[in-house]
Amino acid sequence: MLTFAVLTVSSYDSVLLQQTLSQDFRKVVMAKIMRGEKSLDLLQGLLVFIAWHHHYMDTQAVSITMLLQLCLGIAGDLGLDALSRTVRSPMHKDDTWDREAKRAYLGCYYLSSNIDLMQPGKARSMSHTSTLRNYASELATSWENNSDAVFPILVDVCQYMEDVEETFRNQPEQAVVVRTQVKRLSDKWESIQLAIKLRVNEFSKQKQYTTRTQY
C-alpha cells in the first residue's frame, strides 16, 4: 500500500491517471479495513496519501478528516502507542518494524496537529503525550535516516501549536493574563528556534565528519 500511495501522489503530471489511482487506492483501503487487514504498510500508505495527494481534485471522495481517523484507528489496533522503549543501533534488523512503526505514529501526530488547526473549536484528534516525545528522542538518537534528527523539533512545534490553541480557546481572558500567556508562549517559541539551530549545527558537523572519513 505504501508503494501504491507513492505512485498515486507522484502521478500529478496526468490528472486522469491520478484520479483513477486515487479512486482505486481508496477502494483497496476500504476493502482491507472491512476484511480486518490492518497493517503498518496500510497505515504508511494512508499517511503518504493524506500528506501529499491533491485532495481538492476528489470533491466527492471521503474527507481528509475521515481518512485521518482511519489512520488513528489502525495505529491504535497495532498498539503503536505502547512500543518498546529500547534504543538500539540501526544495525539491529529485528527492530526495523518498531522503528518504522514509531515513525508512522509520529506521522499520525504531525498530520493530526496540522489538520486540527483548520478545525478550530473541535476536539483534538490526537494530543501530545510523553510516548511521542520518547519515540522522537529514540529515533533521533539512533539516527538511521537523516530525517530522524528533526523528529524532536517537529514534536516541539506540534506541541507548541497545541499549547497556543488550548491557551486561547473560547475564553475571554483578562488583559494581564493574556500578556502573561503570550510571554510564556513567546519564550517557548524562542527555545524551539534555538533547539532548531543547535540541531542544524549538529547535523552539519556530522555531515562534514562523514564526508571527511569517506575520503
Segments predicted by a language model, with ranges:
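Protein-protein interaction and targeting regions used for scaffolding, dimerization, and localization
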Residues: 131-133
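Extended, leucine-rich alpha-helical cores of fungal transcription factors
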Residues: 1-4, 15-83, 90-107, 111-128, ...
